[in-house]
Amino acid sequence: MAYAAAPDRRYRRRHVRYEGNEPPGTIVVDTSQRYLYAVEQGGWAMRYGIGVGEEGRTLKGKATIGRKAVWPSWTPTANMIRRKPHLQQYASGVPGGPHNPLGASALYLYRGGQDTMFRLHGTNEPWTIGQAVSSGCIRLTNEDIVDLYERTPLGTTVLVV
């Protein structure tokens, strides 16, 4: 049986000191450093390694978690299919499961009560953590998205920088 390559060790989940000014309960996504921080009390955060969108494709600024799903289905957007025609084969959707690009869980980013189409989600390609390869979503290993999912209520503020 072949196993997927694991992400680089520096992207493993860690409890770290956090120097930012965001209040506990906030999620901060640092796209340049490839880390997501779940801010906790007392100057601490849980830090996760992430994969980010290709240059210019990741949402920036504030959003909130407007929906959560376990083993979500995935359908590529029309824009994704235009950029990557091979995705046409998935235009009717891919059911949730281990071969789904959204992985084990997804946190849906909303602005003004509307779905932005950007997600924090797991991945079936864990070796891409630390890279800028997605169509704009923020990906974590399946183990990490499950951990983040469990500690993140609806309405959580997400700041993407």
Give the predicted meaning of each segment.
Residues 1-83, 96-98:
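Cell wall/extracellular polymer interaction/catalysis modules
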